[in-house]
Amino acid sequence: MNFELETLDLNGAAKEKCDALIVLLATSFKPGKDNLSILVAQALKAGDLESQSGKALVLYRPTGLACARAVLANVGEGSANEVSKAVKAAVLAVKAGNVKKLVICFAALPQEAPLRAAVTAAAEASYVFTTTKSKPEGRVIQRVVVAVSNSSGFKPVFDRAVAAVTGIEFAKEWANRPANHATPALLAGAARSLAKLANIKCEVLGPKQVERLGMGAFMAVAQGSEEPLRFIVLRYDGAQKSAAPTVLLGKGITFDSGGISIKPAADMDEMKFDMSGAASVLGVFLALAQLKPAINVIGLIPSCENLLDGRSVKPGDVVTSMSGQTIEILNTDAEGRLVLCDALTYAERFKPRAVVDIATLTGACVIALGGVRSGLFSADDQLAAALVSAGESSLDLCWRLPLDDDYAEGLKTSFADVANVAGRAGGAITAAKFLQRFAGKFPWAHLDIAGTAWKSGTAKGATGRPVALLLEYLLTSAK
């Protein structure tokens, strides 16, 4: 899908030939004398256009307009969130038709955030996954024109939004793939493909190299699968070599059965989404290649499957992590923290300015925050504030949760330096406390995306989160 930015007022939008014209109307809108304004005024007077934000009215072949369909969408006060809801509703109202060219017109000049929201919402509402379908019905909308009365100064923010969409959809593509279409080796292939782009390099380590590094925790998770593990290292070099990089660490469990601590059968298919953290890292790197910001970023992806086998790690086994700390594995379904802890130790060699890990880590985080906000954990107030701000700006929200030392009491064990689980209470926090033990040499944050990485039910599928949050954080830090 191609996005374009054009300067069009309402009069110009009325003359634009397209399959659908979406007009975004704030409550402050004052109709003029052009054909489109007259149409809006008539709809308001008749009560056909609801005053509630996010509501849309579809008109077919409206008189005086060049479009095949006009959609009048209420954006309330015009905030980014209201624009996002309105655009999604409008696109959903027309996408079943043969809409190839779509024009989204702001009736009044927007702020930057609502314009970005319109781009990302149009992409989300029209997204279709087709990779594993024999006769796919692909995305109908091919061209989206975003129209404002004066586009001067909007090009940088527009390009940023389009790059974010590109990254989000790349993350969705890989997270949505079934596990047999997204093995660790195939995921590594996707990372290697990114190395063809500007400023990106990729290195992939296999089992022997990981063993030499002493990543005993990562290897313990992988040993129950016939699919060999991969440790993916991506580099985006946009600044001088002397500039300390930010490290993004994505959990890459391409399928999680739970191991011997096996998961219930219901919804186990959704465990293909357990590599959504890794997918988000890939998406961010694709967006970085498009935008070329002056920063350095490292992407780390420990990838493997967590399956049952005669060689699978057993509850009670003790393994030695790359840091030298020993871990008693009391629950083999708490495997994400095991692959992440070795990757956190590996991150030390880059002397990073910050490390952010992204993982579908705990069901406890889903219980705490649902599917609205990702869980954020960090002992660094500045880093936490920057990530929260990035989430607010990008509408990819997170919520900071505590990391009090008392929460780590449950991780104590008589048989190793630390256990991989505590009790049920505060499970998202105790998981973060486990990771914190391996992140003492750099500013660190943990994003638990177990509730936000995908949707279940009739809308089942990856969301591409938190690509937008991470990209916003990186671009802001580059200023």
From Swiss-Prot:
SUPFAM superfamilies: Macro domain-like (SSF52949), Zn-dependent exopeptidases (SSF53187)
Matches recorded under PROSITE patterns: CYTOSOL_AP
Keyword Zinc: no
UniProt cofactor(s): Mn(2+)
Keywords linked to the UniProt accession: Aminopeptidase, Cytoplasm, Hydrolase, Manganese, Metal-binding, Protease
InterPro entries: Leucine_aapep/pepB, Macro_dom-like, Peptidase_M17_C, Peptidase_M17_leu_NH2_pept, Peptidase_M17_N
GO cellular component, one term: cytoplasm
Main location group: cytoplasm
Catalytic activity entry: Release of an N-terminal amino acid, Xaa-|-Yaa-, in which Xaa is preferably Leu, but may be other amino acids including Pro although not Arg or Lys, and Yaa may be Pro. Amino acid amides and methyl esters are also readily hydrolyzed, but rates on arylamides are exceedingly low; Release of an N-terminal amino acid, preferentially leucine, but not glutamic or aspartic acids
Gene3D superfamilies associated with the record: Leucine Aminopeptidase, subunit E, domain 1 (3.40.220.10), Zn peptidases (3.40.630.10)
Chain sites annotated for binding Mn(2+) 1: 256, 333, 335
GO terms, molecular function: manganese ion binding; metalloaminopeptidase activity
Subcellular location: Cytoplasm
Protein name, UniProt field: Probable cytosol aminopeptidase
Organism encoding this protein: Albidiferax ferrireducens (strain ATCC BAA-621 / DSM 15236 / T118)
Lineage, highest ranks first: Bacteria, Pseudomonadati, Pseudomonadota, Betaproteobacteria, Burkholderiales
